[in-house]
Amino acid sequence: MLDHGQEDSVVFFADDDNTYDLRLFNELRLTNTLSLFPVGLVTKTGLSSPIVREGKIVGFYDGWISNRKFPVDMAGFAVNLSTLQKASKRRKGRLAMPFTPGYEEDGFLRQLDVQPADAQPLASNCSIVMVWHTKTFYTSRAPVDNLARTKKYKNSNLGILLASL
């Protein structure tokens, strides 16, 4: 893929335990470098999303931030192939998906030498969930974190996003 991929291709890690809104695949085509977008029904908050203000990613809302630079779900990002190719050349072909539970996404994205603020927010500035973690077992609805309703997130996408859950 890195050596023979078509120019302007986009890499997205789809998973069999997710449900996708078909509109997502049109959005993915817009990925120039790295794009980020919300994932529903994930973590204790029920949502993992970039926080967007004035069209820019300014932080993350996730049930487990830890010390991750990119606290995102595997289904919450896409990468333009040219970005992967450049990173691969810088690293002499040593791009990898690290296997450290909870850190795979962060470890992979850190190799790209891209900052979260430089990523493109998709899904109407991250105000629409187009990917859902769905599994076939019973669970109670995740409580909406009351912190998301505070002034800390005022003038961001989270108000619209949480109202849609």
Regions found by a protein language model. Give the residues of each.
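Conserved catalytic core of nucleotide-sugar-dependent glycosyltransferases
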Residues: 2-14, 18-102, 119, 138-154, ...
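Catalytic donor-sugar/metal-binding loop of nucleotide-sugar-dependent glycosyltransferases
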Residues: 107-128
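Structural motif
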Residues: 130-132
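Short beta-strand-to-coil "C-cap" segments at the C-terminal boundary of structured domains/repeats
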Residues: 134-136
